[in-house]
């Protein structure tokens, strides 16, 4: 038996044993409670980084802990394997996307297996496998049958040189194509959408059910859904028999409308534009069409607009207001038209100032209008007194309506409802509930994705691919040039097919699905991952779901998590699931940060200097000798501050890496990588190793503990059961792994100071090894076998603490004189207030400080202190 901890000698051996015993396999249904532990599956980039290691370590601790608590656990792994990088690799390196992806999967699987994670690899799936995307396509057809999938025109990024559609990440900050350098245009193409808006209300309301989710994630989703209640108002257009419909959450400001704004894409744009303005408007629309949605709505850029020459009538005042077109109004949002109220909206105020438009204040602070007659008139558009206020910026606070006809003098809060009711009576408006959420555009003009399983027939229209013909497989003999759109459009042998309904020559859909589709249901496939006959056996999935603990980054707070919730609800409504929400509890782990140095931006880009090139005592740029900023930042190649997992593991072992990751910071916080702290965890595991091996070598007593324990034994037993209670609560309730490991350190310290011949010591050694097992599984299992056990430690039952053992015979009583601590004594734990005062008075400490003084008052805080107030 080696007296020194040698991780390299035990880790591979332990992993081999776990594999032979099948410890990680998902058990069948039984009377045991279930626990589904899941980390967000990775994109197979080919290289594991420390962020991955942290994510999967957290989930692994939970899975191991729950197994030892008697749960049947599923802890699977898969690959989010479709996506743009594989196509780029095909273009740049001539490697087919499938080959590149599967090579990366093989490499990353080996890296993950090296970590010794308790993953059931028999559940493994890859979204790019036909065995998986067959069912992704089947789910698409379920959406189509339910009326939740449809086509309409939508704008895409278009490279005019390469004649191809670009993803947002392929467009640089200057609006140029990453490959050709061409100025990217916006182009309308017919695209597929999912009607997620049909579920907006339920997605919003059911956030209240997610009691195990971080509040900030729920708030982010609520804001993304963006429910608001406001008014739908119609403004007649002068000269044509049309009305401009606007949606506003501020109907109380309608008397302050000084212009209307249409989105450039609005269908009324051409009709309201006068001949005099037509040429200028067309130029403006062309310019805006080449801007991304992000550019148009950015808070950092000034808003641009142009008058159409057309005018509309404010139905409340009868006054004419000019109609403008502006880049910041998007047709997909609301009605594609907004009313401009610069007096009471910050954005409108800036726009009006820029274009010299009227600013009409119709709400004011009560203090500012205290001397005015604000009695409303009987005429809805009349005013009793023109109230002038001199605000230097938009007034956006609640207030009193002024210059607002019959609504003058009432609060802006009350005016909202009153104005909507009036508009409804006059038939030019109504109350409306609106959502910021828009339908989900799922079309991608790319090759490496799940083909959309429909056929376009000139006679029958859109025809679903029959279930028996699924999957619609991606063709393999494809040339990747990065030009002329998706390679699928060029393959006539693949595109041209007979219509399944009438037999007429027809064409396949050449768009593929957004990769978020694949990740919106993968967690439902894991419990029945090898099912070839159906998407999954509902009885199995309903048994295992929902996921009890989901772990992943905050960057997925909105899209992935929202889409997964949407899919779950749709499949429930299709009769496949019997639950409403997919993820019971969510943990968003922090980033892993590494030390780096920064030479701040001085007219150019920030310059990152790797720490290995810098003298930490006097950090300076090695090229310019300028002083550098020392900081921790998210690990990346550009910053040169990454730490390769394999380097840490080869030097310290897997368990040390796990212990550092778990101890350094709470899981939801960012973690700063510090090798000194890694070494600290390595020393701790060495101490545990020596404690156990010294105990074994010494051959000390292992007889069962007797009821008649010495004072020291009682204290040791209390330390043991305090550790059991604390570690259990830290892992089970809040996932405070760092404080759990602190408790393990306290227990090891207590054992180091204890009598090695005591039977309680034997209990403590075995308890320490069991408690450390979820955190450092290799060393724990090895020590368990060295203790003479034949079974794996990971099959042991998690210990329960004995409440009686936690009760101390004695407590520490602090002695104070005039509120100042003078020392402490040990007293019986059950002593009452009178006894505590007696012990304190008789103590040597009190005698020393109160001798010769008159005691005026004694304050006793039971279980804590006695304070003497003296003259």
Swiss-Prot record:
Signal peptide: none
Positions bound to ATP: 637
Keyword NAD included in the entry's annotation: no
GO biological process entries: leucyl-tRNA aminoacylation
GO cellular component assignments: cytosol
Main location, first listed in the record: cytoplasm
Keywords: Aminoacyl-tRNA synthetase, ATP-binding, Cytoplasm, Ligase, Nucleotide-binding, Protein biosynthesis
Stated name of the protein: Leucine--tRNA ligase
């Amino acid at each position: 038996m080696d007296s020194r901890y040698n991780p390299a000698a035990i880790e591979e051996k332990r992993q081999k044993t776990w594999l032979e015993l099948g410890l990680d396999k998902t058990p069948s249904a039984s009377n045991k409670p279930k626990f589904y532990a899941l980390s967000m599956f990775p994109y197979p980039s080919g290289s594991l980084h420390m962020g991955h290691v942290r994510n999967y370590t957290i989930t692994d601790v939970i899975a191991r802990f729950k197994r030892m608590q008697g749960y049947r656990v599923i802890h699977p792994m898969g690959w989010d394997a479709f996506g743009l990088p594989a196509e780029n690799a095909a273009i740049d390196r001539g490697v087919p996307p499938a080959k590149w992806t599967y090579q990366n999967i093989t490499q990353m699987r080996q890296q993950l297996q090296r970590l010794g994670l308790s993953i059931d690899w028999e559940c493994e799936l890859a979204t790019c496998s036909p065995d998986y995307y067959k069912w992704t396509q089947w789910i698409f057809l379920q959406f189509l049958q339910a009326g939740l999938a449809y086509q309409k025109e939508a704008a895409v990024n278009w490279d005019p040189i390469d004649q191809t559609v670009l993803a947002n990440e392929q467009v640089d900050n200057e609006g140029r194509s990453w490959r050709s350098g061409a100025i990217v245009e916006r182009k309308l193409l017919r695209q597929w959408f999912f009607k997620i808006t049909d579920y907006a209300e339920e997605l919003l309301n059911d956030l209240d059910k997610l009691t195990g989710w971080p509040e900030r994630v729920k708030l982010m989703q609520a804001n993304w859904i963006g429910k608001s209640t406001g008014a739908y108002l119609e403004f007649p257009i002068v000269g044509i028999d049309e009305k401009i419909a606007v949606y506003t959450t501020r109907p109380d400001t309608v008397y302050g409308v000084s212009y209307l704004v249409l989105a450039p894409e609005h269908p009324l744009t051409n009709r309201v534009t006068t001949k005099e303005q037509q040429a200028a408007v067309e130029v403006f629309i062309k310019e805006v069409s080449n801007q991304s949605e992000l550019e148009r709505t950015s808070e950092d850029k000034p808003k641009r607009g142009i008058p159409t020459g057309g005018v509309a009538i404010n139905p409340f005042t009868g006054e004419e207001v000019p109609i403008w077109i502006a880049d910041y109004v998007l047709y997909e949002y609301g009605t594609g038209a907004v009313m401009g109220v610069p007096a009471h909206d910050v954005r409108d105020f800036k726009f009006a100032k820029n274009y010299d438009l009227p600013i009409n204040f119709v709400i004011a602070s009560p203090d500012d209008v205290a001397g005015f007659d604000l009695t409303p008139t009987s005429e809805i558009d009349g005013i009793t007194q023109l109230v002038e206020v001199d605000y230097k910026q938009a007034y956006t606070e609640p207030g009193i309506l002024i210059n607002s006809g019959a609504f003058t003098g009432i609060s802006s809060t009350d005016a909202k409802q009153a104005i909507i009711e009036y508009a409804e009576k006059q038939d030019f408006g109504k109350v409306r509930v609106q959502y910021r959420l828009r339908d989900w555009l799922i079309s991608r003009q790319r090759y490496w994705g799940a083909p959309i399983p429909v056929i376009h027939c000139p006679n029958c229209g859109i025809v679903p691919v029959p279930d028996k013909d699924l999957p619609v497989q991606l063709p393999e003999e494809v040339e990747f040039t990065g030009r002329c759109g998706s390679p699928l459009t060029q393959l006539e042998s693949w595109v041209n097919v007979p219509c399944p309904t009438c037999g007429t020559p027809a064409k396949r859909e050449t768009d593929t699905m957004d990769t978020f589709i694949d990740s919106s249901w993968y967690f439902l496939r894991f419990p029945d991952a090898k099912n070839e006959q159906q998407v999954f056996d509902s009885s199995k999935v309903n048994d295992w779901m929902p996921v009890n603990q989901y772990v992943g980054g905050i960057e997925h707070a909105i899209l992935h998590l929202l889409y997964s919730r949407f899919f779950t609800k749709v499949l429930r409504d299709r009769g496949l699931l019997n639950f409403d929400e997919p993820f019971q509890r969510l943990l968003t782990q922090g980033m892993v940060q590494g030390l780096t140095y920064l030479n701040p931006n001085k007219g150019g880009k920030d310059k990152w200097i790797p720490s290995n090139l810098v003298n930490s005592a006097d950090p300076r740029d090695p090229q310019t000798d300028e002083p550098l900023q020392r900081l921790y930042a998210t690990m990346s190649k550009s910053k040169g501050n990454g730490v390769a997992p394999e380097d840490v593991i080869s030097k310290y072992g897997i368990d040390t890496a796990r212990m550092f990751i778990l101890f350094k910071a709470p899981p939801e916080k960012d973690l700063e990588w510090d090798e000194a702290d890694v070494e600290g965890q390595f020393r701790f595991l060495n101490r545990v190793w020596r404690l156990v091996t010294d105990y074994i070598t010494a051959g000390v007593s292992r007889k069962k503990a007797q009821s008649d324990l010495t004072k020291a034994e009682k204290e040791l037993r209390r330390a043991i059961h305090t550790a059991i209670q604390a570690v259990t609560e830290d892992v089970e309730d809040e996932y405070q792994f760092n404080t759990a490991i602190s408790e393990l350190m306290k227990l090891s310290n207590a054992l180091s100071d204890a009598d090695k011949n005591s039977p309680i010591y034997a209990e403590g050694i075995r308890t320490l090894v069991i408690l450390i097992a979820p955190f450092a599984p290799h060393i724990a299992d090895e020590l368990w076998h060295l203790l003479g056990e034949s079974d794996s430690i990971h099959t042991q039952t998690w210990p329960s603490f004995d409440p009686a053992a936690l009760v101390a015979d004695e407590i520490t009583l602090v002695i104070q004189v005039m509120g100042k601590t003078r020392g402490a004594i040990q007293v019986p734990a059950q002593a009452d207030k009178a006894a505590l005062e007696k012990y304190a008075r008789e103590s040597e400490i009190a005698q020393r400080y109160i001798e010769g003084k008159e005691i005026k008052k004694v304050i006793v805080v039971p279980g804590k202190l006695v304070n003497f107030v003296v003259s």
